């Protein structure tokens, strides 16, 4: 007992936000076992409170000195904390989004919330993981819960199909990533910490060996799959279309934030001497994602499949900041991801509300929604315009700063393609908005004709509508406060010893 207590004193405070998530998970399971199968909708309070508490503790620990703990397997600094905050924020918003959906579909509440908490836990650990084993375990903690969540509606054939594709391709990518890690372990002389692996590659003079080319390739393939970069994106449309919509909302942001943090850390710490090579590869992946994602999104008839291809293009934009390879680039990534969380979750909140009242996901069935539900249509249009980067919404300022940082870093062709494809994205977003406000009777489907409006202006009937309003307001107002947000992100990144000592500034 003394040893356990000493270990907690030594390590527990440094991972207190993660410990709170674990405690919330344990309490959730205990409460469920006590109440059995009784109707306990208030169970959502447990994970929600745990997530909010974790964010609060994270803020209190923000100014603490950077450390590497757990015998070198976990790194804590403000660079990692800012990504952990984004993950926790996304989870806090996703829990209310799932309340009414799960009640309508009569899915098991406890297991769903347990998977959300466990996936969040894996994502937060992934942001600070400092050795290949911890990285792999954290990534699989996130991935396995993602597979289970995507197939949560087990009676739905599309959901089962999506889960199988996700599981098979996810397992393959994880195997490739583990294979790359094994090369790093061998070439570095048996080192395990990321910093020691980099030093080992230099001391053993293995940087010019063929094996050193295999390791970053395997790493980028694994990361490319998790981020849905082209050509590793094939699973994304099917998973988005077949999975429960709250799950899609969760996965569309959390995995991107966590794996982006991993990509920045592992590529800059382990492969700084081959930065030109992996920069070139990432440029090709980013360009392919921006072009293919936006052009295929135009042809989609399913709303969730359209957002799947839209998310592929969005990660292409985010890659511009990562490829920039300096503190300003990473600041732009953090800033845009903060805006992306609100505008993307706001969009999915609108889809959840519409599909729960109509049972359809077809884009054509949204025609005339403004006549029946002006509030929902207005919120949906606002989020779509923000995703497209239309001023004065937050998406515009996020993309503007992202492209400016890329231009300053000399990525002129990449930024030019980003600007061009952003215009393409505005086209298919406006096409949907045109459908929302149409007054032509021949375009209005029976879904809208029989639509029952259960909400009134500025009045929330359920937590999903409340979450939608929060996301819409944030995706609008945050654009007006972009300068303070950029300043806070810059201060957090500059104060991190990770960025000051290891990243290319």
From Swiss-Prot:
Protein name as catalogued: NAD(P)H-quinone oxidoreductase subunit 2, chloroplastic
NCBIfam families (UniProt xref): NDH_I_N, PRK02504.1
Catalytic activity: a plastoquinone + NADH + (n+1) H(+)(in) = a plastoquinol + NAD(+) + n H(+)(out); a plastoquinone + NADPH + (n+1) H(+)(in) = a plastoquinol + NADP(+) + n H(+)(out)
Localization per record: Plastid, Chloroplast thylakoid membrane
Classification lineage: Eukaryota, Viridiplantae, Streptophyta, Embryophyta, Tracheophyta
Membrane topology annotation: Multi-pass membrane protein
Species, as recorded: Huperzia lucidula
E.C. no: 7.1.1.-
Record PANTHER family: NADH DEHYDROGENASE
Free-text function comment from the UniProt entry: NDH shuttles electrons from NAD(P)H:plastoquinone, via FMN and iron-sulfur (Fe-S) centers, to quinones in the photosynthetic chain and possibly in a chloroplast respiratory chain. The immediate electron acceptor for the enzyme in this species is believed to be plastoquinone. Couples the redox reaction to proton translocation, and thus conserves the redox energy in a proton gradient.
Subunit structure: NDH is composed of at least 16 different subunits, 5 of which are encoded in the nucleus.
Keywords: Chloroplast, Membrane, NAD, NADP, Plastid, Plastoquinone, Quinone, Thylakoid, Translocase, Transmembrane, Transmembrane helix, Transport
The keyword Plastid belongs to this UniProt entry's keyword annotation: yes
Any Pfam family matching the protein: Proton_antipo_M
Gene responsible for this protein: ndhB
Record-stated family: Belongs to the complex I subunit 2 family.
InterPro entries documented for this protein: NADH-Q_OxRdtase_suN/2 (IPR010096), ND/Mrp_TM (IPR001750), Ndh2_N (IPR045693)
């Amino acid at each position: 007992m003394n040893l356990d207590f000493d270990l907690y004193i030594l390590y527990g405070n440094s991972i207190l936000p993660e410990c709170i998530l674990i405690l919330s998970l344990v309490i959730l399971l205990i409460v469920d076992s006590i109440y059995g199968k009784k109707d306990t909708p208030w169970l959502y309070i447990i994970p929600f409170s745990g997530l909010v508490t974790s964010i609060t503790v994270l803020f209190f620990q923000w100014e603490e000195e950077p450390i590497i703990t757990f015998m070198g397997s976990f790194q804590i600094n403000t660079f990692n904390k800012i990504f952990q905050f984004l993950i926790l924020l996304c989870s806090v918003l996703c829990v209310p989004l799932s309340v009414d959906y799960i009640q309508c579909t009569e899915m098991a509440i406890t297991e769903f919330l347990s998977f959300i908490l466990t996936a969040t836990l894996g994502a937060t650990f992934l942001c600070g993981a400092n050795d290949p084993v911890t990285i792999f375990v954290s990534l699989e903690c996130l991935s396995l819960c993602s597979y289970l969540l995507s197939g949560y509606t087990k009676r739905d054939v599309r959901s089962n199909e999506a889960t199988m594709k996700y599981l098979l391709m996810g397992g393959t990518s994880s195997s490739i990533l583990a294979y790359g890690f094994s090369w790093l372990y061998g070439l570095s002389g048996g080192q395990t910490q990321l910093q020691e692996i980099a030093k080992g590659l230099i001391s053993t003079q293995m940087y010019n060996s063929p094996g050193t080319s295999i390791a970053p390739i395997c790493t980028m393939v694994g990361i490319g799959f998790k981020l849905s970069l082209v050509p590793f994106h094939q699973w994304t449309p099917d998973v988005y279309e077949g999975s429960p919509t709250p799950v899609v909302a969760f996965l569309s942001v959390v995995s991107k934030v966590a794996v982006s943090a991993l990509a920045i850390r592992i590529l800059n710490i382990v492969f700084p001497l081959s930065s030109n090579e992996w920069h070139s590869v990432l440029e090709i992946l980013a360009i392919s994602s921006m072009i293919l994602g936006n052009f295929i999104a135009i042809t989609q008839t399913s709303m969730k499949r359209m957002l799947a291809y839209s998310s592929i293009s969005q990660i292409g934009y985010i890659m511009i900041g990562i490829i920039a390879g300096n503190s300003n680039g990473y600041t732009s990534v953090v800033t845009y991801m903060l805006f992306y969380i609100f505008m993307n979750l706001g969009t999915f909140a609108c889809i959840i509300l519409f599909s729960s009242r109509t049972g359809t996901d077809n884009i054509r069935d949204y025609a005339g929604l403004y006549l029946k539900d002006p509030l929902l249509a207005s919120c949906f249009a606002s989020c779509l315009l923000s995703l497209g980067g239309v001023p004065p919404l937050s998406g515009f300022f996020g993309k503007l700063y992202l492209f400016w940082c890329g231009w300053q870093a000399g990525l002129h062709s990449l930024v030019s393609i980003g600007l061009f494809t952003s215009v393409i994205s505005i086209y298919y977003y406006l096409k949907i908005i045109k459908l929302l406000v149409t007054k032509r009777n021949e375009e209005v489907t029976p879904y809208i004709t029989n639509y029952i409006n259960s909400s009134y202006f500025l009045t929330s009937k359920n937590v999903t509508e409340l979450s939608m309003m929060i996301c819409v307001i944030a995706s609008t107002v945050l654009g007006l406060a972009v300068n303070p947000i950029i300043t806070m992100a810059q201060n957090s990144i500059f104060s991190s010893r990770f960025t000051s000592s290891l990243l290319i500034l």
